[in-house]
C-alpha cells in the first residue's frame, strides 16, 4: 500500500521544482531593465538557455534603444513601449544571471547559439524593487545587430 502512495505522489512531487522555477509573478514587468555585456558560463540547454552577463563598469543605455526595430511575435507584447521605458538597474552587480527562452523557441527565432565571450544585450525584467539575486528574465535579446523576441514564437 505504501508503495502505491509513493508512486501516485511522484508526478506531483517531481513537478514542484519546475513550477517553482517558472513562477514569474515576482518579476516586475512594469520596469524593463536593459543589460549589455559579455556572455560567461553559457548553458545552451532546456528547460531554457541561461548565461551570466558580465557588465562593464560604465554601463549606459544606448542612444538608439528607444527607436530600435523589434520583430513581431505571436504574443501581444508592446515592445516599443518597453524600449521607451527601459532603464539600467539601480543595483551595482557586475554579473547578472540571464534566463532566456526554451531552446525550441530560440530555434524558431533562429537565434545563433551564444558562446562565452560574445557581446550580448538583453531587455527584460528582474524582481520587484530589484530585491533578491541579480536575475533577469529576458524579453528581447540583441545579437549581431538583430533583435529577437523571446516571449513567444515569431509571426
What is each stretch, according to the model?
Residues 107-121:
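Short nucleic-acid-contacting surface segments enriched for D/E, G, S/T with interspersed K/R
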Residues 3-7:
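N-terminal export leaders
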Residues 128-152:
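OB-fold/S1-family single-stranded nucleic acid-binding modules
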Residues 32-45:
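Structural detector for short beta-strands of small beta-barrel domains
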Residues 93-109:
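Beta-strand/loop nucleic-acid-binding surfaces
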Residues 45-56:
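Short aromatic-glycine-enriched beta-strand elements
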Residues 19-31:
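Short boundary/loop segments of OB/S1/cold-shock single-stranded nucleic-acid-binding domains
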Residues 15-17:
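N-terminal signal peptide c-region/cleavage motif recognized by signal peptidases
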Amino acid at each position: 500500500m505504501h508503495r502505491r502512495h509513493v508512486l501516485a505522489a511522484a508526478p506531483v512531487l517531481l513537478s514542484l521544482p519546475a513550477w517553482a522555477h517558472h513562477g514569474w509573478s515576482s518579476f516586475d514587468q512594469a520596469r524593463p531593465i536593459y543589460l549589455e555585456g559579455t556572455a560567461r558560463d553559457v548553458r545552451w540547454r532546456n528547460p531554457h538557455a541561461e548565461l551570466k552577463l558580465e557588465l562593464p563598469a560604465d554601463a549606459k543605455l544606448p542612444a538608439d534603444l528607444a527607436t530600435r526595430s523589434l520583430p513581431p511575435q505571436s504574443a501581444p507584447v508592446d515592445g516599443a513601449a518597453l524600449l521607451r521605458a527601459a532603464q539600467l538597474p539601480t543595483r551595482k552587480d557586475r554579473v547578472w544571471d540571464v534566463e532566456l527562452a526554451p531552446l525550441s523557441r530560440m530555434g524558431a527565432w533562429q537565434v545563433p547559439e551564444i558562446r562565452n565571450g560574445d557581446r550580448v544585450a538583453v531587455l527584460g525584467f528582474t524582481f520587484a524593487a530589484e530585491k533578491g539575486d541579480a536575475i533577469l528574465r529576458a524579453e528581447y535579446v540583441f545579437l549581431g545587430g538583430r533583435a529577437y523576441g523571446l516571449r513567444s514564437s515569431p509571426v
